[in-house]
Protein backbone atom coordinates (compact mmCIF):
# COMPACT_ATOMS: atom_id res chain seq x y z
CA UNK A 1 0.00 0.00 0.00
CA UNK A 2 2.84 2.35 0.91
CA UNK A 3 4.56 1.57 -2.38
CA UNK A 4 1.34 2.36 -4.27
CA UNK A 5 1.06 5.67 -2.41
CA UNK A 6 4.66 6.61 -3.33
CA UNK A 7 3.96 5.80 -6.97
CA UNK A 8 0.86 8.01 -6.98
CA UNK A 9 2.80 10.81 -5.31
CA UNK A 10 5.55 10.66 -7.93
CA UNK A 11 2.93 10.62 -10.69
CA UNK A 12 1.21 13.69 -9.23
CA UNK A 13 4.48 15.60 -8.96
CA UNK A 14 5.31 14.64 -12.56
CA UNK A 15 1.95 15.74 -13.88
CA UNK A 16 1.85 19.01 -11.94
CA UNK A 17 4.25 20.95 -14.26
CA UNK A 18 2.33 19.70 -17.30
CA UNK A 19 -0.96 20.76 -15.75
CA UNK A 20 0.41 24.20 -14.86
CA UNK A 21 1.74 24.58 -18.41
CA UNK A 22 -1.63 23.67 -19.95
CA UNK A 23 -3.57 25.94 -17.60
CA UNK A 24 -1.26 28.92 -18.17
CA UNK A 25 -1.37 28.37 -21.93
CA UNK A 26 -5.18 28.20 -21.88
CA UNK A 27 -5.31 31.35 -19.76
CA UNK A 28 -3.00 33.24 -22.11
CA UNK A 29 -5.01 32.18 -25.16
CA UNK A 30 -8.27 33.20 -23.47
CA UNK A 31 -6.85 36.55 -22.42
CA UNK A 32 -5.49 37.20 -25.92
CA UNK A 33 -8.80 36.34 -27.61
CA UNK A 34 -10.82 38.44 -25.19
CA UNK A 35 -8.62 41.52 -25.69
CA UNK A 36 -8.50 41.30 -29.52
CA UNK A 37 -4.71 41.37 -29.64
CA UNK A 38 -2.87 40.76 -32.94
CA UNK A 39 -2.37 37.08 -33.82
CA UNK A 40 0.53 35.31 -32.16
CA UNK A 41 2.40 31.99 -31.99
CA UNK A 42 1.88 29.76 -28.97
CA UNK A 43 3.78 31.25 -26.02
CA UNK A 44 5.69 29.45 -23.29
CA UNK A 45 5.18 30.39 -19.63
CA UNK A 46 7.56 33.04 -18.26
CA UNK A 47 9.73 33.43 -21.38
CA UNK A 48 6.85 33.83 -23.84
CA UNK A 49 8.32 33.84 -27.35
CA UNK A 50 11.94 34.65 -26.50
CA UNK A 51 12.96 31.17 -27.66
CA UNK A 52 11.77 32.01 -31.20
CA UNK A 53 14.08 34.99 -31.70
CA UNK A 54 16.93 33.53 -33.74
CA UNK A 55 19.54 35.75 -35.38
CA UNK A 56 19.24 37.69 -37.58
CA UNK A 57 16.06 38.79 -35.84
CA UNK A 58 14.63 40.80 -38.76
CA UNK A 59 14.65 37.65 -40.92
CA UNK A 60 13.03 35.61 -38.14
CA UNK A 61 10.29 38.22 -37.76
CA UNK A 62 9.81 38.27 -41.53
CA UNK A 63 9.25 34.49 -41.48
CA UNK A 64 6.72 34.87 -38.66
CA UNK A 65 4.88 37.62 -40.57
CA UNK A 66 4.49 35.27 -43.54
CA UNK A 67 2.67 32.89 -41.22
CA UNK A 68 0.72 35.27 -38.96
CA UNK A 69 0.26 38.33 -41.18
CA UNK A 70 1.65 41.88 -41.46
CA UNK A 71 0.80 42.57 -37.81
CA UNK A 72 1.36 40.04 -35.04
CA UNK A 73 2.30 40.08 -31.38
CA UNK A 74 5.01 38.43 -29.31
CA UNK A 75 5.40 38.03 -25.58
CA UNK A 76 9.04 38.82 -24.81
CA UNK A 77 9.11 37.70 -21.22
CA UNK A 78 6.98 40.27 -19.41
CA UNK A 79 6.90 42.61 -22.44
CA UNK A 80 4.17 42.50 -25.05
CA UNK A 81 5.57 43.46 -28.45
CA UNK A 82 3.68 44.13 -31.68
CA UNK A 83 5.52 43.69 -34.98
CA UNK A 84 4.32 45.45 -38.15
CA UNK A 85 5.57 44.69 -41.66
CA UNK A 86 3.47 46.68 -44.12
CA UNK A 87 3.61 50.33 -45.29
CA UNK A 88 -0.07 50.99 -44.52
CA UNK A 89 0.31 49.78 -40.94
CA UNK A 90 3.48 51.83 -40.44
CA UNK A 91 1.63 54.88 -41.73
CA UNK A 92 -1.16 54.19 -39.23
CA UNK A 93 1.42 53.94 -36.43
CA UNK A 94 3.13 57.23 -37.20
CA UNK A 95 0.19 59.38 -38.29
CA UNK A 96 -2.91 58.37 -36.33
CA UNK A 97 -0.92 57.06 -33.35
CA UNK A 98 2.21 59.20 -33.59
CA UNK A 99 1.88 60.82 -30.14
CA UNK A 100 0.83 57.62 -28.36
CA UNK A 101 3.85 55.83 -29.88
CA UNK A 102 6.34 58.69 -29.47
CA UNK A 103 8.11 57.18 -26.44
CA UNK A 104 10.69 54.40 -26.20
CA UNK A 105 10.80 51.29 -23.97
CA UNK A 106 12.94 51.41 -20.82
CA UNK A 107 15.85 49.01 -20.94
CA UNK A 108 18.52 48.84 -18.22
CA UNK A 109 21.51 49.01 -20.55
CA UNK A 110 19.95 51.74 -22.67
CA UNK A 111 19.06 53.86 -19.65
CA UNK A 112 22.48 53.54 -18.07
CA UNK A 113 24.63 54.30 -21.07
CA UNK A 114 22.53 55.69 -23.90
CA UNK A 115 19.93 58.00 -22.53
CA UNK A 116 21.52 60.31 -19.94
CA UNK A 117 18.38 60.01 -17.80
CA UNK A 118 16.19 59.85 -20.93
CA UNK A 119 17.27 63.22 -22.36
CA UNK A 120 18.62 62.10 -25.76
CA UNK A 121 16.77 62.23 -29.08
CA UNK A 122 16.31 58.46 -28.98
CA UNK A 123 15.00 58.22 -25.42
CA UNK A 124 13.35 61.48 -24.34
CA UNK A 125 9.67 61.20 -23.47
CA UNK A 126 7.12 63.08 -25.54
CA UNK A 127 6.71 66.62 -24.25
CA UNK A 128 8.36 70.02 -24.32
CA UNK A 129 11.95 68.72 -24.22
CA UNK A 130 11.11 66.23 -27.00
CA UNK A 131 9.84 69.09 -29.20
CA UNK A 132 12.78 71.31 -28.29
CA UNK A 133 15.42 68.73 -29.22
CA UNK A 134 13.77 68.05 -32.58
CA UNK A 135 13.41 71.76 -33.32
CA UNK A 136 17.05 72.44 -32.46
CA UNK A 137 18.23 69.46 -34.52
CA UNK A 138 16.24 70.60 -37.55
CA UNK A 139 17.24 74.27 -37.32
CA UNK A 140 20.73 74.27 -35.82
CA UNK A 141 22.29 71.01 -37.02
CA UNK A 142 20.51 69.68 -40.11
CA UNK A 143 19.39 72.81 -41.92
CA UNK A 144 20.70 73.41 -45.44
CA UNK A 145 22.68 76.46 -44.33
CA UNK A 146 24.28 74.54 -41.46
CA UNK A 147 25.27 71.60 -43.64
CA UNK A 148 26.62 73.95 -46.30
CA UNK A 149 28.75 75.80 -43.75
CA UNK A 150 30.41 72.50 -42.82
CA UNK A 151 31.00 71.32 -46.39
CA UNK A 152 34.75 71.95 -46.15
CA UNK A 153 35.02 69.32 -43.39
CA UNK A 154 33.42 66.64 -45.53
CA UNK A 155 35.50 67.61 -48.56
CA UNK A 156 38.74 67.51 -46.53
CA UNK A 157 38.03 64.05 -45.16
CA UNK A 158 37.03 62.65 -48.56
CA UNK A 159 40.25 64.08 -50.05
CA UNK A 160 42.28 62.42 -47.27
CA UNK A 161 40.65 59.08 -48.11
CA UNK A 162 41.30 59.56 -51.84
CA UNK A 163 44.99 60.35 -51.22
CA UNK A 164 45.25 57.24 -49.05
CA UNK A 165 43.74 55.04 -51.77
CA UNK A 166 45.98 56.66 -54.40
CA UNK A 167 49.06 55.93 -52.29
CA UNK A 168 48.08 52.29 -51.84
CA UNK A 169 47.53 51.81 -55.59
CA UNK A 170 50.53 53.86 -56.76
CA UNK A 171 52.38 50.70 -57.88
CA UNK A 172 49.40 49.14 -59.62
CA UNK A 173 46.28 47.32 -58.55
CA UNK A 174 46.12 46.58 -54.83
CA UNK A 175 43.69 44.75 -52.57
CA UNK A 176 42.13 47.05 -49.95
CA UNK A 177 39.60 46.61 -47.16
CA UNK A 178 37.29 49.58 -47.51
CA UNK A 179 35.23 49.22 -44.34
CA UNK A 180 37.90 50.47 -41.87
CA UNK A 181 38.64 53.35 -44.23
CA UNK A 182 34.97 54.28 -44.40
CA UNK A 183 34.81 54.12 -40.59
CA UNK A 184 37.77 56.51 -40.37
CA UNK A 185 36.05 58.83 -42.86
CA UNK A 186 32.62 58.90 -41.21
CA UNK A 187 34.01 59.08 -37.67
CA UNK A 188 36.26 62.04 -38.48
CA UNK A 189 33.46 63.88 -40.30
CA UNK A 190 31.12 63.51 -37.31
CA UNK A 191 33.81 64.34 -34.76
CA UNK A 192 34.92 67.47 -36.61
CA UNK A 193 31.33 68.66 -36.92
CA UNK A 194 30.58 67.88 -33.27
CA UNK A 195 33.84 68.77 -31.55
CA UNK A 196 36.37 69.99 -34.12
CA UNK A 197 38.52 66.86 -33.58
CA UNK A 198 40.13 64.15 -35.70
CA UNK A 199 40.72 60.84 -33.93
CA UNK A 200 41.11 58.42 -36.84
CA UNK A 201 43.80 57.91 -39.46
CA UNK A 202 47.34 56.59 -39.94
CA UNK A 203 48.83 59.80 -38.52
CA UNK A 204 46.82 59.53 -35.27
CA UNK A 205 47.53 55.94 -34.20
CA UNK A 206 49.86 57.03 -31.38
CA UNK A 207 47.88 60.09 -30.26
CA UNK A 208 46.90 59.40 -26.62
CA UNK A 209 43.58 61.28 -26.68
CA UNK A 210 42.61 59.76 -30.02
CA UNK A 211 43.53 56.25 -28.87
CA UNK A 212 41.45 56.67 -25.70
CA UNK A 213 38.42 57.74 -27.71
CA UNK A 214 38.78 54.89 -30.21
CA UNK A 215 38.98 52.34 -27.38
CA UNK A 216 35.88 53.77 -25.69
CA UNK A 217 33.83 53.77 -28.90
CA UNK A 218 35.00 50.28 -29.88
CA UNK A 219 34.03 48.95 -26.44
CA UNK A 220 30.70 50.75 -26.69
CA UNK A 221 29.71 49.11 -29.98
CA UNK A 222 30.61 45.68 -28.56
CA UNK A 223 28.46 46.00 -25.44
CA UNK A 224 25.50 47.93 -26.80
CA UNK A 225 24.47 44.98 -28.99
CA UNK A 226 24.34 42.57 -26.04
CA UNK A 227 20.98 41.58 -24.54
CA UNK A 228 20.20 41.83 -20.83
CA UNK A 229 17.75 39.09 -19.83
CA UNK A 230 16.48 41.28 -16.98
CA UNK A 231 14.94 43.65 -19.51
CA UNK A 232 12.42 40.94 -20.37
CA UNK A 233 12.09 38.99 -17.11
CA UNK A 234 11.89 41.52 -14.24
CA UNK A 235 12.63 38.97 -11.51
CA UNK A 236 16.11 38.63 -13.04
CA UNK A 237 16.56 42.36 -13.56
CA UNK A 238 19.31 42.81 -11.02
CA UNK A 239 20.97 39.42 -11.49
CA UNK A 240 23.95 39.88 -13.78
CA UNK A 241 24.83 36.40 -15.04
CA UNK A 242 27.77 37.90 -16.93
CA UNK A 243 29.88 40.99 -16.23
CA UNK A 244 27.88 42.77 -18.95
CA UNK A 245 26.08 45.31 -16.73
CA UNK A 246 29.19 46.01 -14.65
CA UNK A 247 31.15 46.68 -17.83
CA UNK A 248 28.39 48.95 -19.08
CA UNK A 249 28.59 50.94 -15.85
CA UNK A 250 32.34 51.32 -16.16
CA UNK A 251 32.10 52.24 -19.83
CA UNK A 252 29.38 54.78 -19.07
CA UNK A 253 31.64 56.55 -16.58
CA UNK A 254 34.61 56.60 -18.97
CA UNK A 255 32.48 57.93 -21.80
CA UNK A 256 30.88 60.56 -19.58
CA UNK A 257 34.29 61.82 -18.41
CA UNK A 258 35.60 62.01 -21.98
CA UNK A 259 32.57 63.92 -23.29
CA UNK A 260 32.64 66.25 -20.29
CA UNK A 261 36.28 67.00 -21.13
CA UNK A 262 35.27 68.00 -24.67
CA UNK A 263 32.56 70.32 -23.32
CA UNK A 264 34.92 71.94 -20.78
CA UNK A 265 37.52 72.43 -23.52
CA UNK A 266 34.94 74.23 -25.65
CA UNK A 267 33.99 76.51 -22.77
CA UNK A 268 37.51 77.91 -23.03
CA UNK A 269 37.40 78.17 -26.82
CA UNK A 270 34.11 79.52 -28.13
CA UNK A 271 35.36 80.41 -31.61
CA UNK A 272 35.11 76.99 -33.24
CA UNK A 273 32.12 76.25 -35.49
CA UNK A 274 31.06 73.04 -33.75
CA UNK A 275 27.87 71.48 -32.49
CA UNK A 276 29.15 71.65 -28.90
CA UNK A 277 29.65 75.42 -29.11
CA UNK A 278 26.17 75.80 -30.60
CA UNK A 279 24.77 73.91 -27.61
CA UNK A 280 26.81 76.03 -25.18
CA UNK A 281 25.33 79.19 -26.70
CA UNK A 282 21.85 77.72 -26.21
CA UNK A 283 22.82 76.73 -22.67
CA UNK A 284 23.59 80.35 -21.81
CA UNK A 285 20.12 81.36 -23.00
CA UNK A 286 18.15 78.42 -21.51
CA UNK A 287 20.32 76.55 -18.98
CA UNK A 288 17.42 74.42 -17.77
CA UNK A 289 16.90 72.94 -21.25
CA UNK A 290 20.49 72.48 -22.39
CA UNK A 291 22.34 70.89 -19.50
CA UNK A 292 25.73 69.24 -19.92
CA UNK A 293 24.02 65.83 -19.81
CA UNK A 294 21.80 66.77 -22.75
CA UNK A 295 24.86 67.92 -24.72
CA UNK A 296 26.73 64.69 -23.91
CA UNK A 297 23.73 62.60 -24.88
CA UNK A 298 23.48 64.41 -28.20
CA UNK A 299 27.19 63.80 -28.89
CA UNK A 300 26.66 60.08 -28.29
CA UNK A 301 23.58 59.89 -30.51
CA UNK A 302 25.43 61.63 -33.36
CA UNK A 303 28.30 59.15 -33.07
CA UNK A 304 25.92 56.18 -33.08
CA UNK A 305 23.81 57.48 -35.97
CA UNK A 306 26.61 58.77 -38.17
CA UNK A 307 29.60 56.42 -38.00
CA UNK A 308 28.96 52.66 -38.18
CA UNK A 309 25.66 53.16 -40.00
CA UNK A 310 27.02 55.38 -42.77
CA UNK A 311 30.17 53.26 -43.16
CA UNK A 312 28.00 50.16 -43.59
CA UNK A 313 25.81 51.90 -46.18
CA UNK A 314 28.91 53.02 -48.12
CA UNK A 315 30.33 49.50 -48.05
CA UNK A 316 27.09 48.05 -49.44
CA UNK A 317 26.91 50.75 -52.12
CA UNK A 318 30.42 49.96 -53.36
CA UNK A 319 29.77 46.21 -53.22
CA UNK A 320 26.62 46.64 -55.31
CA UNK A 321 28.43 48.82 -57.85
CA UNK A 322 31.29 46.32 -58.22
CA UNK A 323 28.81 43.46 -58.65
CA UNK A 324 26.79 45.42 -61.23
CA UNK A 325 29.31 47.02 -63.64
CA UNK A 326 26.49 48.26 -65.90
CA UNK A 327 25.19 50.40 -63.02
CA UNK A 328 28.71 51.68 -62.29
CA UNK A 329 29.19 52.60 -65.94
CA UNK A 330 25.87 54.47 -66.07
CA UNK A 331 26.85 56.40 -62.94
CA UNK A 332 30.20 57.34 -64.53
CA UNK A 333 28.45 58.63 -67.64
CA UNK A 334 26.14 60.78 -65.52
CA UNK A 335 29.12 62.23 -63.61
CA UNK A 336 30.99 62.99 -66.85
CA UNK A 337 27.90 64.66 -68.31
CA UNK A 338 26.81 66.71 -65.30
CA UNK A 339 30.13 67.49 -63.60
CA UNK A 340 32.86 66.83 -66.15
CA UNK A 341 36.44 67.20 -64.95
CA UNK A 342 35.49 69.47 -62.06
CA UNK A 343 35.44 68.40 -58.43
CA UNK A 344 31.97 67.49 -57.24
CA UNK A 345 30.28 70.20 -55.20
CA UNK A 346 27.25 69.61 -53.02
CA UNK A 347 25.23 71.81 -55.36
CA UNK A 348 25.83 69.18 -58.07
CA UNK A 349 23.97 66.51 -56.14
CA UNK A 350 20.53 67.67 -57.30
CA UNK A 351 21.63 67.06 -60.91
CA UNK A 352 22.90 63.54 -60.22
CA UNK A 353 19.54 61.79 -60.36
CA UNK A 354 20.92 58.33 -61.10
CA UNK A 355 23.35 58.57 -58.20
CA UNK A 356 20.40 59.35 -55.94
CA UNK A 357 18.65 56.24 -57.29
CA UNK A 358 21.74 54.16 -56.42
CA UNK A 359 21.67 55.50 -52.86
CA UNK A 360 17.94 54.80 -52.50
CA UNK A 361 18.27 51.27 -53.89
CA UNK A 362 21.22 50.52 -51.60
CA UNK A 363 19.24 51.67 -48.57
CA UNK A 364 16.20 49.70 -49.72
CA UNK A 365 18.10 46.42 -49.91
CA UNK A 366 20.35 47.12 -46.92
CA UNK A 367 18.57 49.48 -44.52
CA UNK A 368 20.75 51.07 -41.87
CA UNK A 369 18.23 49.81 -39.30
CA UNK A 370 16.56 46.55 -40.47
CA UNK A 371 14.38 46.87 -37.36
CA UNK A 372 13.58 50.47 -36.49
CA UNK A 373 14.30 51.58 -32.94
CA UNK A 374 11.42 50.24 -30.80
CA UNK A 375 8.58 52.53 -29.78
CA UNK A 376 6.41 52.28 -26.68
CA UNK A 377 2.64 52.73 -26.39
CA UNK A 378 1.93 55.26 -23.64
CA UNK A 379 -1.83 54.52 -23.88
CA UNK A 380 -4.15 51.97 -25.50
CA UNK A 381 -4.46 52.37 -29.27
CA UNK A 382 -5.51 50.35 -32.31
CA UNK A 383 -3.36 49.29 -35.27
CA UNK A 384 -4.88 47.37 -38.15
CA UNK A 385 -8.08 46.93 -36.16
CA UNK A 386 -6.28 45.21 -33.28
CA UNK A 387 -5.85 46.48 -29.74
CA UNK A 388 -2.34 47.57 -28.78
CA UNK A 389 -2.43 48.01 -24.98
CA UNK A 390 -0.50 50.67 -23.08
CA UNK A 391 2.97 49.41 -22.27
CA UNK A 392 3.39 47.51 -25.56
CA UNK A 393 6.65 47.75 -27.50
CA UNK A 394 6.24 48.42 -31.23
CA UNK A 395 8.73 46.91 -33.69
CA UNK A 396 8.75 47.95 -37.36
CA UNK A 397 10.47 45.50 -39.71
CA UNK A 398 11.84 47.87 -42.35
CA UNK A 399 13.86 45.08 -43.96
CA UNK A 400 10.69 43.06 -44.62
CA UNK A 401 8.76 46.06 -45.98
CA UNK A 402 11.57 47.00 -48.35
CA UNK A 403 11.78 43.47 -49.76
CA UNK A 404 8.03 42.83 -49.92
CA UNK A 405 7.03 41.55 -53.40
CA UNK A 406 3.61 43.16 -52.91
CA UNK A 407 5.33 46.55 -52.77
CA UNK A 408 8.41 46.10 -54.97
CA UNK A 409 8.89 44.41 -58.33
CA UNK A 410 11.68 41.79 -58.18
CA UNK A 411 12.53 42.95 -54.64
CA UNK A 412 15.77 40.96 -54.17
CA UNK A 413 17.49 42.46 -57.21
CA UNK A 414 19.63 45.60 -57.25
CA UNK A 415 17.82 47.89 -59.72
CA UNK A 416 18.41 51.63 -59.15
CA UNK A 417 16.26 52.34 -62.21
CA UNK A 418 13.13 51.44 -60.23
CA UNK A 419 13.39 54.86 -58.54
CA UNK A 420 13.37 56.64 -61.90
CA UNK A 421 9.90 55.49 -62.91
CA UNK A 422 8.04 53.64 -60.17
CA UNK A 423 5.96 55.46 -57.57
CA UNK A 424 5.97 54.29 -53.99
CA UNK A 425 4.03 55.16 -50.88
CA UNK A 426 5.47 57.32 -48.14
CA UNK A 427 6.28 54.34 -45.89
CA UNK A 428 7.57 51.89 -48.49
CA UNK A 429 11.15 53.09 -47.95
CA UNK A 430 12.05 53.71 -44.30
CA UNK A 431 15.76 52.86 -43.91
CA UNK A 432 16.27 55.18 -40.91
CA UNK A 433 12.95 55.58 -39.16
CA UNK A 434 9.56 57.17 -39.32
CA UNK A 435 8.97 60.20 -41.51
CA UNK A 436 10.17 62.91 -39.14
CA UNK A 437 13.41 61.13 -38.31
CA UNK A 438 13.89 60.14 -41.93
CA UNK A 439 14.03 63.77 -43.04
CA UNK A 440 16.77 64.50 -40.51
CA UNK A 441 18.73 61.37 -41.35
CA UNK A 442 18.55 61.93 -45.09
CA UNK A 443 19.78 65.50 -44.62
CA UNK A 444 22.65 64.13 -42.58
CA UNK A 445 23.61 61.35 -44.99
CA UNK A 446 23.45 63.58 -48.05
CA UNK A 447 25.40 66.24 -46.24
Positions of the model-derived regions?
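Conserved cytochrome P450 K-helix E-x-x-R motif and the immediately C-terminal K′/meander segment
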Residues: 50-69, 257, 265, 325, ...
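Juxtamembrane membrane-interface segments of multi-pass membrane proteins
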Residues: 157, 262-267, 321-342
